[in-house]
């Protein structure tokens, strides 16, 4: 079933579950990354080299997060995007201020980090470095 590219993110924090409920629906690796703020191994993610047309949603709650049109190859070893679907993610500064943690606005699942000012030739000069295991890809079928 095609996914709408104009999907609107639900209100902040609207998906809340207990750890036992998250464990029931997530793989152990998804739980470690999304709920415990882990990081998957560099270059091993399912979506690192995928550049098909579609939508990347939160693996925890299915909130649409990124359009494939904002994905680029940064060479960092994780899927990279230069912008998110408006309202879909939250950015929280980390100690030192060099990067921001990004989480799903709906379920607070850890996605990865945003680094700014690296000089990539994108519209925002931002790199949203996202764990593949935090994402679920849905292809947009062309008719």
Curated annotation (Swiss-Prot):
Instruction: Name the chemical reaction catalysed here.
Output: L-methionyl-[protein] + [thioredoxin]-disulfide + H2O = L-methionyl-(R)-S-oxide-[protein] + [thioredoxin]-dithiol
Q: Which domain of life is it from?
A: Eukaryota
* One cellular component (GO) term of this entry: cytosol
GO process annotations (BP): protein repair; response to oxidative stress
Residue ranges of domain MsrB in the record: 19-140
Q: Where in the cell is it found?
A: Cytoplasm, Cytosol
Q: Which cysteines are joined by disulfide bonds?
A: 76-129
Catalytic residues (positions): 129 (nucleophile)
**What is the E.C. number?**
1.8.4.12
What binding details are noted for the cofactor?
Answer: Binds 1 zinc ion per subunit.
> Could you say which residues bind Zn(2+) here?
58, 61, 104, 107
Q: Where are the transmembrane segments?
A: none
Q: Which UniProt keywords apply?
A: Cytoplasm, Disulfide bond, Electron transport, Metal-binding, Oxidoreductase, Redox-active center, Transport, Zinc
Q: Which GO terms describe its molecular function?
A: metal ion binding; peptide-methionine (R)-S-oxide reductase activity
Required cofactor(s): Zn(2+)
What InterPro entries is this protein classified in? Answer: Met_Sox_Rdtase_MsrB (IPR028427), Met_Sox_Rdtase_MsrB_dom (IPR002579), Mss4-like_sf (IPR011057)
Describe the function of this protein: Catalyzes the reduction of methionine sulfoxide (MetSO) to methionine in proteins. Plays a protective role against oxidative stress by restoring activity to proteins that have been inactivated by methionine oxidation. MSRB family specifically reduces the MetSO R-enantiomer.
Query: Which NCBIfam families does the UniProt record give?
Result: peptide-methionine (R)-S-oxide reductase MsrB
Family of the protein in this entry: Belongs to the MsrB Met sulfoxide reductase family.
Q: Can you say what this protein is called?
A: Peptide methionine sulfoxide reductase B9
UniProt organism field: Arabidopsis thaliana (Mouse-ear cress)
Give the encoding gene's name.
MSRB9
């Amino acid at each position: 079933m095609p996914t709408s590219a104009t999907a609107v993110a639900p209100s902040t924090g609207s998906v809340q579950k207990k750890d036992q409920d998250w464990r029931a629906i997530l793989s152990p690796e998804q739980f470690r990354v999304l709920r415990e703020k882990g990081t998957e191994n560099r270059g091993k993610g399912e979506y690192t080299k995928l550049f098909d047309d579609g939508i990347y949603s939160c693996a925890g709650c299915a909130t649409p997060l990124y359009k494939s049109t904002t994905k680029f190859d940064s060479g960092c070893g994780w899927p990279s995007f230069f912008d998110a679907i408006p309202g879909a993610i939250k950015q929280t500064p980390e100690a030192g201020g060099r990067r921001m943690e990004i989480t799903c606005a709906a379920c607070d699942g850890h996605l990865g980090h945003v680094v700014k000012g690296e000089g990539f030739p994108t519209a925002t000069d931002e790199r949203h470095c996202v764990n593949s295991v935090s994402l679920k890809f849905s292809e947009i079928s062309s008719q």
